[in-house]
Amino acid sequence: MPTIEPIARGLVPVDSSAADLLGAPNYDEFQSDQEVWELLQQRPHSVLRVTMPHCAVPSLADILEEESPAALELAALNMQRLKAEPLVRQVSGVLWIYEIESPATARRPQIGLGGMARTSEIRTAANPAGTIIRNEGIKESKARGRAVLVEVTGCDMGTVNLAVDDDAGRLEAALRAYAGSRAPDYETRDEAGNLHRVWLELDPARQRQLQELVMAEPRAYVADGNHRSAAAAMLGVGVFQAVFFPAATMTIAPYNRLVREPARQVSDLRREIENYFEVQVVPPEDVPFQPLRTHVIGLYDGERWWRLLPRPGTFDPDDAAQDIDADIVQRLLFERVLGIGDAKDERLVFVGANRDARWLQSQVDAGNYRYAVTLPPVTMQQFVRVCLQGKLMPPKSTWFVPKIRSGLMMALL
């Protein structure tokens, strides 16, 4: 069973107006440093000055090298300034109920219980009985970069998104009842129009009731934040900030690709693709094409959109990881047709659902990229199946929405 503990020392916005000023997207939601810098110009009080300190500079020309000594020194300085500001207050021994209402999804609002999870419960080769299941390979340099930032600031801002089965619906029912019992302590709306509401719970008796519901779950799955949880383990702090969400309230959006150049010359693209896919021209009314059904893939070549359907026998449907369309595209289209065998190849650019198919098409039309590839969203059933088989998700295959907002709960270490 996974464990959730109260946050010993939390730093929170004093009210909704402060939450508006402090809140920000996570560090991995941006396509470029310029995007971060531009948002900081609009919202200089946001926690991006701490989470992306290399961009918290007067001009684009002044942007620092990420994770450089100068950037880390600036992060520590900005954290000290933040702690001294009237925008925040400290709370001790707190759990928090977190609800996100999204206008972009038809689902009911996503709701979860926030606190500290244990690094000792993460499932690894050395700890196969761990109840927090990762599903993504860890890049040590990326995790170490997050760890160093936590260390120099003395604060864990990178909340990990954990999904639990909640088959009986008891956790969701309890959280919704709680949220309906009183007004939130603060709320804020993000750039996409999502409404984030937070309730702080300090009473030990009520905390235990909620903790027991999480601890009744057999396992939790890391939906977002594999590297953030790994960073805590590297520091040896024993806990990391997390929110446990019932899986039924969660949504996965498409995670698409742009291709700069193929690694090999392809004289007849359609002919080569047809070795692995049935190829159909997308009708004008469906352009730009964003597939929503599993095993339907979109490809834009600068002239037209194609619908690609993997041929039988090109993947193993019983292998949960091979059944993910991102893996099918990587093996069959990128590797075999375009010669790009490594998903980390700089010719590939991964684009989350905060950019739509029209934007991808515009990038190809502008000559910035050769191809755009659109993938259907992974289903929660596919995601859980990969976890239960002990497999790893293909790189950049799940884009959970709406995203947890940085700056609404900060755990001081």
Annotated model-derived regions:
Residues 1-413:
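Surface-exposed, charge/polar-rich loops and edge strands
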